[in-house]
């Protein structure tokens, strides 16, 4: 097994660390759950608007029309998926009951896992390709990716744990988002190698950025406010952005950003 692939696997596996942190102790309170949703929104927004979309537009051979077109395609793709999934009344999330939480929270957990998985897949490809071309830079990007996969795992595990009451399920779902990154690295190892087209990679990143922005603004932030109306979800958003910003600083320090 190649060193770049090992780095990609380790970076993706860091999601499980966040997942375990998300299920330790008692079942998350509404306040903690709302914070975790805002935290996830902050992560997604910063990654999408400050890293993925600019990188996609700056890629060699990428035109602004194609870049922004794929971004809009991602937005519309999210709303298409959103319409296919069942809706429940948001105020039902506030009910304190021994019954399982309503489908709206489970639906959000599904979309959150999907959104982060879609981000992690091309990220796994990027980690592998970078490490293949320059192992020193590969170590840097793998470290930064691992650091921000920890809060991503936490952000996924919290809502899933609240929706299902099962720690095992929460860890599994969070792990799926990390496995998507590993899958991207494995496919790059098997098929793409170092020959992946910059335009194809940029188009994927732009579309995923659109999906993540739509998910954050339309789903995560409103639901966080509905779950805990007494607190501002912006605090979670700002914390998520701060943690992710620190990870991006590590990328730049490594000479990748």
Swiss-Prot record:
It comes from the Bacteria. The chain crosses the membrane at residues 5-25, 32-52, 61-81, 137-157, 171-191, 195-215, 236-256. It is found in: Cell inner membrane. Zn(2+) binds at residues 123, 148, 152. Pfam families: Zip. Its main location: membrane. It catalyses: Zn(2+)(in) = Zn(2+)(out). The keyword Disulfide bond does not apply. Fe(2+) binds at residues 120, 123, 149, 152, 181. Keywords: Cell inner membrane, Cell membrane, Ion transport, Iron, Membrane, Metal-binding, Transmembrane, Transmembrane helix, Transport, Zinc, Zinc transport. GO terms for molecular function: metal ion binding; zinc ion transmembrane transporter activity. GO terms for cellular component: plasma membrane. It is a multi-pass membrane protein. PANTHER family: ZINC TRANSPORTER ZUPT, ZINC/IRON TRANSPORTER. Mediates zinc uptake. May also transport other divalent cations. NCBIfam families: PRK04201.1. Belongs to the ZIP transporter (TC 2.A.5) family. ZupT subfamily. This is Zinc transporter ZupT.
């Amino acid at each position: 097994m190649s060193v770049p692939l090992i780095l990609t696997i380790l970076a993706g596996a860091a999601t499980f660390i966040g997942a375990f942190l998300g299920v330790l102790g008692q079942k998350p309170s509404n306040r903690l759950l709302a914070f975790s949703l805002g935290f996830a929104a902050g992560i997604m927004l910063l990654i999408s608007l400050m890293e993925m979309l600019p990188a996609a537009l700056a890629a060699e051979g990428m035109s602004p029309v194609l870049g922004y077109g794929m971004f809009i395609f991602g937005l519309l793709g999210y709303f298409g998926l959103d319409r296919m999934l069942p809706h429940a009344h948001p105020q039902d999330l506030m009910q304190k009951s021994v019954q399982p939480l309503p489908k709206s929270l489970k639906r959000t957990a599904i979309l959150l896992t999907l959104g982060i998985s879609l981000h992690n897949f091309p990220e796994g490809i990027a980690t592998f390709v970078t490490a293949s071309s320059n192992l020193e830079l590969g170590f840097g990007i793998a470290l930064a990716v691992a650091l921000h996969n920890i809060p991503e795992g936490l952000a996924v595990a919290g809502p899933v744990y609240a929706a299902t009451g099962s720690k095992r399920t929460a860890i599994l779902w969070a792990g799926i988002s990390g496995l998507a990154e590993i899958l991207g690295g494995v496919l790059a190892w098997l098929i793409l190698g170092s020959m992946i087209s910059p335009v194809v990679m940029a188009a994927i990143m732009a579309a995923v950025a659109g999906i993540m922005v739509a998910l954050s603004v339309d789903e995560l932030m409103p639901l966080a406010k509905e779950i805990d109306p007494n607190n501002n979800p912006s605090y979670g958003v700002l914390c998520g952005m701060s943690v992710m910003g620190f990870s991006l600083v590590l990328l730049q320090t490594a000479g990748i950003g």
